[in-house]
């Protein structure tokens, strides 16, 4: 059983905005320290950014307007906490406590992820999809239901009828769709709106990639300040995650679909 949402789901819009601001921070300095929370809906986008490098309201507003349209932007930017900054002063260390797992992706999860991408390539609007064995549920906004019935004749499509979706119908918040992003690898920490020093980003990516490579479950934990995880220097894990983020096109692109 698996649920997948597309990049125009309000929660993913929030993730994408958060990712865009992290990308902006990395354009300004090589290793920023940043954590961004986004709440979006009904014409307003609220953003709080704790950051070592100033982004400015103009940069944040430009990202919101590009991704979500001409919304009113409420932007709060504060410096990173001094104790957290000191943790990274002498080298790359885990930026927070956390538990993590990587689980090999199942065929069912791969199948639904592809269905979601196929539909989104034709209808780039808010959508949510579920696959539970033979039961396929497709909720796709702004679509021609008959088109989907022709391709997926056995699916349950828009059970309550046609709908519009988007941030004028539903609110979105950062890191609220981790099940969609990570499948069975979801634990407590969110992937989006954070720099690579955050274990929620780098260790989650590392554990997921290791599980796909070994085809075995991976479980890890860390304490803030740790300089090794899984017997490897944390700096090495950060570079693995950095290369992965680069391979998908940056933090904003990563936020579109997550790891699955």
Cite the ranges covered by each PLM segment:
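A domain-level signal for the structural core that forms small-molecule/cofactor-binding pockets
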Residues: 1-260
């Amino acid at each position: 059983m698996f649920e997948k949402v597309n990049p125009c789901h309000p929660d993913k819009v929030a993730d994408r905005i958060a990712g865009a601001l992290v990308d902006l921070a990395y354009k300004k300095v090589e290793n920023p320290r940043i954590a961004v929370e986004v709440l979006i809906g009904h014409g307003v986008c609220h953003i709080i950014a704790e950051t070592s490098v100033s982004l400015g309201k103009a940069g944040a507003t430009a990202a919101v307007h590009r991704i979500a349209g001409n919304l009113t932007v409420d932007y709060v930017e504060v410096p990173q906490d001094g104790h957290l900054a000191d943790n990274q002063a002498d080298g790359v260390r885990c930026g927070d406590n956390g538990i993590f797992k990587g689980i090999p992706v199942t065929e069912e999860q791969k199948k639904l992820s592809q269905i979601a991408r196929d539909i989104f390539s034709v209808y780039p609007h808010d959508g949510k999809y579920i696959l539970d064995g033979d039961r396929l549920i497709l909720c796709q906004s702004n679509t021609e239901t008959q088109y989907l019935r022709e391709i997926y004749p056995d699916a349950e499509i828009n059970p309550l009828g046609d709908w519009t979706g988007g941030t004028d119908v539903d609110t979105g918040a950062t890191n609220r769709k981790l099940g969609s992003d990570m499948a069975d690898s979801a634990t407590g920490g969110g992937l989006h709106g954070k720099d690579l020093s955050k274990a929620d980003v780098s260790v989650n990516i590392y554990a997921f990639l290791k599980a796909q490579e070994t085809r075995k479950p991976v479980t890890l934990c860390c304490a803030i300040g740790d300089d090794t995880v899984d017997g490897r220097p944390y700096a090495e894990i950060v570079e693995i995650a950095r290369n992965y983020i680069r391979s998908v096109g940056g933090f904003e692109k990563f936020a579109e679909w997550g790891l699955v």
